[in-house]
Amino acid sequence: MSRRKIPIKRSPKPDSIYRSRLVNMMVNRILKNGKKSLASHILYNAMKEIKHKTKKNPSLILRQAVVRATPKITIKARRIGGSNYQVPVEIKPEKGHSLAIRWLLTASRKRTGKNMVFKLANELLDAAKDTGGAIRKKEETHRMAEANRAFAHFRY
């Protein structure tokens, strides 16, 4: 039995401009090689681009994009009796949001375009409209979970 204390889960701090934890989570996910100022520059300029294109509040569009890309269920590989089963598992909202942010960023990195600002802005706009690469990934995950529904009784 471990004697170590269970660490208290820290919530992410809100960012300085939009006062949003979601924006800060997004900045930390964009981050590469410790260049946080560049990551925040990319996200803030993408938000300005969204405001310029839609004339709406960009933080609401970001929140809507993340909510629409958030999966409710995922699959985990479970080894039972010498064979691997893809078992559908419900996930917590925090985990779902972090997956959605990750999928939004990978989909925006795969896009063709001038730079990351425009690619991220377009991916967020598409996700808010229920299209785009991140939404496709979410639907694919839900399809896989539905296909493997028979193995749901192997839950963890």
Curated annotation (Swiss-Prot):
Q: Which CDD domains match?
A: uS7_Chloroplast
Pfam families assigned to the protein according to its UniProt record, in alphabetical order: Ribosomal_S7 (PF00177)
Q: Which GO terms describe its molecular function?
A: rRNA binding; structural constituent of ribosome
Name where it's found: Plastid, Chloroplast
Instruction: Tell me which GO cellular component terms the UniProt record holds.
Output: chloroplast; small ribosomal subunit
Per UniProt, the keywords (alphabetical) are: Chloroplast, Plastid, Ribonucleoprotein, Ribosomal protein, RNA-binding, rRNA-binding
Question: SUPFAM superfamilies annotated for this entry?
Answer: Ribosomal protein S7 (SSF47973)
The keyword Plastid is assigned to this record: yes
Q: Which GO terms describe its biological process?
A: translation
Q: RNA-binding among the record's keywords?
A: yes
- Cystines in this chain: none
Similarity-based family: Belongs to the universal ribosomal protein uS7 family.
Protein task: One of the primary rRNA binding proteins, it binds directly to 16S rRNA where it nucleates assembly of the head domain of the 30S subunit.
Quaternary structure (record): Part of the 30S ribosomal subunit.
The name of this protein is Small ribosomal subunit protein uS7c
In the record, what lineage is assigned to the organism producing the protein?
A: Eukaryota, Viridiplantae, Streptophyta, Charophyceae, Charales
**Encoding gene per record:** rps7
